[in-house]
């Protein structure tokens, strides 16, 4: 985990806003290991939304959805059954963090498809310290990232699976290429992801003509040709192991 963007919603009630601000500041001050709190990074690994009532928060969630950036939500009781005529929708991988047993039970009923966790709020409870809260949230962050990554990989596997292709090597390369595309949209391509794909393309024995057909079916021919150039520039792939002719890299994207 590299960077966590912590967003503070502008709640209407002064008391709730004070609680949210105090909670956010305490979380930053605790500085749990492996977590870098940045509010200016437009492409974080994870977004933690504290409070949930203003338009800016809704826009933040919409942008996260478009870029497939995972986020967790600590509503601070802003999702009570009587506070919303239209409750916000959260992707199934989104984790909701309740601050009390009552809120936990209510969120579990309102969002049965989401994971709901109970983590005490050190601002209003002496039963948990800010250090303990930060350590617990670090575990929640790791869980959220793992859940989101599994969902992304499952979506990719389903997309490739619809081809009905039986060649395992072709399917593996397509899945890895689409995952590189996902990381590219997130502005966070891991070198290990590139190296693994380059190594797979170099070692695999597959029908290059069939691969070209599958790329055409997925409408990935142009993007994959640019990805080949990207792999040659940033990893170990060489021309002899490219199934189609490489094109100059013009900031490739794989939908």
Label every model-predicted segment.
Residues 119-128, 134:
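Short beta-strand->alpha-helix junction loop in the catalytic core
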Residues 39-57, 70-74, 187:
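Short N-terminal targeting/anchoring amphipathic segment
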Residues 104-123:
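Helix-loop-beta element that forms the nucleotide-linked donor phosphate-binding surface
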């Amino acid at each position: 985990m590299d960077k966590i963007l912590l967003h503070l919603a502008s709640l209407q009630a002064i008391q709730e806003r004070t609680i949210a601000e105090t909670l956010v500041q305490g979380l930053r001050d605790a500085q749990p290991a492996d977590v870098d709190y940045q509010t200016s990074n437009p492409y974080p690994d994870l977004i933690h939304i504290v409070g949930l009532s203003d338009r800016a928060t809704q826009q933040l969630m919409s942008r996260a959805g478009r870029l497939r950036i995972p986020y967790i939500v600590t509503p601070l009781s802003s999702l009570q059954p009587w506070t919303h005529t239209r409750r916000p929708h959260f992707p199934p991988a989104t984790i909701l963090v309740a601050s009390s047993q009552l809120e936990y039970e209510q969120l579990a009923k309102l969002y049965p498809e989401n994971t709901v966790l109970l983590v005490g709020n050190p601002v209003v409870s002496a039963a948990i310290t800010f250090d303990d809260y930060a350590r617990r949230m670090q575990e929640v962050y790791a869980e959220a990232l793992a859940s989101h990554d599994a969902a992304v990989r499952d979506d990719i596997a389903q997309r490739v699976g619809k081809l009905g292709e039986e060649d395992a090597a072709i399917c593996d390369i397509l899945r890895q290429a689409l995952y590189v595309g996902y990381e590219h949209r997130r502005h966070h391509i891991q070198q290990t992801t590139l190296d693994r794909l380059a190594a797979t393309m170099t070692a695999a024995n597959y029908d290059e003509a069939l691969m070209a057909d599958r790329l055409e079916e997925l409408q990935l021919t142009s993007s994959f040709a640019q990805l080949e150039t990207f792999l040659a520039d940033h990893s170990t792939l060489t021309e002899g192991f490219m199934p189609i002719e490489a094109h100059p890299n013009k900031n490739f994207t794989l939908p």
